[in-house]
């Protein structure tokens, strides 16, 4: 079968966008709507992955559980947010998807939205109660991801929703450390103007300025001094 991702026919139909065939199968056997495959995924997981909004809406109308997790702890919301499925994220949230659910890495849907620069989805999640400072198993937040990836608008969005700039991950790095290390100049400058400390040391006993390359460290030092002087 085209696009065979699952050992369950109903999941393959969901992934391939075969709405009519899916409806026919489920109406003949309602239990198929919630049956799990080799990855502990349901038809809803696979429809979210492939972005088939009509199939997602059909399944949600049937009342399928929205918070079931696959064998890696991914909920349909994780999958839709990571894949950039705006309309599906909206539909899942309306149906009560748990916005702060974590997968086996400790990541929320917001971690993936921030990492993959999904602006509208990040706003929907935050408006829906997502914790902007949620930490994964490495103590990294969405801000760590946005800063490291150079997603400037995402940094702005997270700041608007009061995300902290000085949380340290398991390596002792703040988002500013990561922005400096990856030479994300505009992101680093923005973080410093919004209260990110240039003095916090990571586990290698390095501050963001010591991690910064080229002339970035000097630029950040001047910004920080200017901010301190105006306080």
UniProtKB/Swiss-Prot annotation:
Keyword Repeat appears in the UniProt entry = yes
Q: Which residues form a coiled coil?
A: none
Q: Which SUPFAM superfamilies match?
A: Ankyrin repeat
Signal peptide (UniProt feature, chain positions): none
Q: Which Pfam families match?
A: Ank, Ank_2
InterPro entries with a match to the protein in the record: Ank_repeat_dom-contain_49, Ankyrin_rpt, Ankyrin_rpt-contain_sf
The molecular function GO annotations come to:
RNA polymerase II-specific DNA-binding transcription factor binding
Q: Could you tell me the Gene Ontology terms of the biological process aspect for this record?
A: apoptotic process; negative regulation of apoptotic process; negative regulation of DNA damage response, signal transduction by p53 class mediator; negative regulation of MAPK cascade; negative regulation of NF-kappaB transcription factor activity; negative regulation of release of cytochrome c from mitochondria; negative regulation of transcription by RNA polymerase II; positive regulation of cell growth
- Identify the keywords attached in UniProt to this record, alphabetized: ANK repeat, Apoptosis, Chaperone, Cytoplasm, Nucleus, Repeat
Write out the GO cellular component annotations: cytoplasm; cytoskeleton; nucleus; proteasome complex; proteasome regulatory particle, base subcomplex
Where is this chain's protein located in or outside the cell? Cytoplasm; Nucleus
ANK repeats at which positions?
3-36, 37-69, 70-102, 103-135, 136-168, 169-201, 202-226
What is the annotated role of this protein in its UniProt record? Acts as a chaperone during the assembly of the 26S proteasome, specifically of the PA700/19S regulatory complex (RC). In the initial step of the base subcomplex assembly is part of an intermediate PSMD10:PSMC4:PSMC5:PAAF1 module which probably assembles with a PSMD5:PSMC2:PSMC1:PSMD2 module. Independently of the proteasome, regulates EGF-induced AKT activation through inhibition of the RHOA/ROCK/PTEN pathway, leading to prolonged AKT activation. Plays an important role in RAS-induced tumorigenesis. Acts as an oncoprotein by being involved in negative regulation of tumor suppressors RB1 and p53/TP53. Overexpression is leading to phosphorylation of RB1 and proteasomal degradation of RB1. Regulates CDK4-mediated phosphorylation of RB1 by competing with CDKN2A for binding with CDK4. Facilitates binding of MDM2 to p53/TP53 and the mono- and polyubiquitination of p53/TP53 by MDM2 suggesting a function in targeting the TP53:MDM2 complex to the 26S proteasome. Involved in p53-independent apoptosis. Involved in regulation of NF-kappa-B by retaining it in the cytoplasm.
Subunit structure of this chain's protein: Part of transient complex containing PSMD10, PSMC4, PSMC5 and PAAF1 formed during the assembly of the 26S proteasome. Stays associated throughout the assembly of the PA700/19S RC and is released upon association with the 20S core. Interacts with PSMC4. Interacts with RB1. Interacts with CDK4. Interacts with MDM2. Interacts with RELA. Associates with a CDK4:CCND2 serine/threonine kinase complex. Interacts with ARHGDIA and increases the interaction between ARHGDIA and RHOA, hence promotes ARHGDIA inactivation of RHOA and ROCK.
Protein's name according to its UniProt entry: 26S proteasome non-ATPase regulatory subunit 10
């Amino acid at each position: 079968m085209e696009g065979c991702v699952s050992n369950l026919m109903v999941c393959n139909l969901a992934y391939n966008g075969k709405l009519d065939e899916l409806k026919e199968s489920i109406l003949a056997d309602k239990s198929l709507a919630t049956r799990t495959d080799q990855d502990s995924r349901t038809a809803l997981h696979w429809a979210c992955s492939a972005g088939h909004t009509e199939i997602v809406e059909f399944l949600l109308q049937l009342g399928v559980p929205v918070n079931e997790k696959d064998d890696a702890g991914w909920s349909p919301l994780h999958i839709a947010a990571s894949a950039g499925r705006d309309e599906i994220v909206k539909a899942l949230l309306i149906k009560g998807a748990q916005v702060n659910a974590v997968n086996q890495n400790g990541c929320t849907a917001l971690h993936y939205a921030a990492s993959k620069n999904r602006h509208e989805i990040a706003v929907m999640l935050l408006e829906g109660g997502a914790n902007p400072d949620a930490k994964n198993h490495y103590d990294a937040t969405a801000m760590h991801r946005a800063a490291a990836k150079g997603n400037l608008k995402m940094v702005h969005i997270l700041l608007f929703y009061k995300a902290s700039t000085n949380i340290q991950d398991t390596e002792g790095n703040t988002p500013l450390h990561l922005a400096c290390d990856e030479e994300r100049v505009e992101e680093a400058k923005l973080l410093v103007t919004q209260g990110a400390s240039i003095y916090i040391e990571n586990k290698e006993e390095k501050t963001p300025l010591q991690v910064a390359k080229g002339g970035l460290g000097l630029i950040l030092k001047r910004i920080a001094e200017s901010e301190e002087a105006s306080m």
